């Protein structure tokens, strides 16, 4: 496994179980703020920074030049944040199938782990703390070889909060961890934006996982280097790459 130095994982739907809860949080916020949002549109934007989703939906509904556009976006986003944070503070939360076993295996192979997300920092911190994944991370959310993960990056730490599909979260993780060759990085996530960000960052592989927001058939429509039903299957692929 000498060629792979870092695996970049998405969070909700990839390493953290998501039974469409995030999608439902969007719908509740939309309903409360008079925003029309179809399931197809919302699911298609999973993985993007959450404010961007509301910007897109309000643009579709009234146009970005409407005098109420900015205030409507902010109103919907604030309501969504309250709903989302309450959900992650109060509802059961657990890793996806094979996640912790894969983390242990990567550690045994001296491969670093970074978590990226479409969530903003506050809700990401709630998730990390509840799962105990924040142990060993410093104030910049960078860990050591002994911590469970070595980096946590959100759009909140990126200029203008530009998350996926831009490559910046992956590139920031690489920089913080002292990894300078993108071809030593593998990316995996459960949305089209995860796949796209892996390619935009010029990763060695950009893989998809189908136990999150998108089915295999849905992800297969987008460029990818392989799709897996679980992180356990993904681990088998990584093992085979080392042969």
Give residue spans per PLM region:
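Glycine-rich phosphate-binding loop signature in dinucleotide/nucleotide-binding domains
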Residues: 2, 109-111, 177-182, 241-242
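N-terminal helical cap/lid subdomain that shapes the substrate entry/recognition surface
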Residues: 2-100, 108-109
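Acidic di-acidic motifs
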Residues: 17, 189-190
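Short, acidic loop-to-helix structural element flanking the phosphoryl-transfer center
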Residues: 85-115, 119-132, 167
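Substrate-recognition "cap/lid" segment bordering the active-site pocket of phosphatases
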Residues: 121-186, 192-200, 216-218
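Short, glycine/polar-rich helix-capping loops at beta-to-alpha or helix-loop-helix junctions
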Residues: 211-222
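Short acidic-hydrophobic, aromatic-tinged amphipathic segments that line or gate anion-handling sites
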Residues: 226-233
């Amino acid at each position: 496994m000498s060629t792979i130095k870092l695996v970049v994982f998405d969070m909700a739907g990839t390493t953290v179980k998501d039974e469409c809860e995030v999608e439902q949080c969007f719908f509740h916020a939309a309903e409360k703020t008079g925003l029309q949002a179809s399931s197809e549109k919302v699911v298609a934007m999973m993985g993007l920074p959450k404010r961007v989703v509301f910007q897109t939906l309000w643009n579709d509904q009234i146009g970005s030049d409407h005098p109420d556009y900015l205030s409507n976006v902010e109103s919907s986003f604030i309501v969504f944040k309250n709903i989302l944070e309450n959900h992650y503070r109060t509802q059961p939360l657990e890793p996806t199938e094979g996640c912790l076993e894969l983390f242990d295996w990567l550690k045994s192979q001296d491969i670093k782990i970074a978590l990226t997300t479409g969530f903003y920092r506050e809700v990401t911190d709630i998730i990390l703390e509840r799962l105990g994944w924040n142990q060993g991370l410093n104030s910049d959310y960078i860990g050591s070889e002994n911590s469970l993960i070595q980096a946590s990056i959100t759009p909140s730490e990126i200029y203008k909060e530009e998350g996926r599909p831009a490559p910046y979260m992956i590139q920031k993780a690489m920089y913080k961890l002292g990894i300078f060759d993108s071809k030593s990085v593998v990316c995996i996530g459960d949305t089209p934006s995860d796949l796209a960000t892996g390619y935009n960052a010029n990763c060695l592989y950009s893989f998809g996982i189908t136990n999150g927001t998108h089915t295999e058939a849905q992800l297969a429509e987008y460029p990818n280097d392989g799709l897996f039903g679980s992180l356990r299957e993904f681990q088998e692929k990584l093992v085979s790459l080392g042969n």
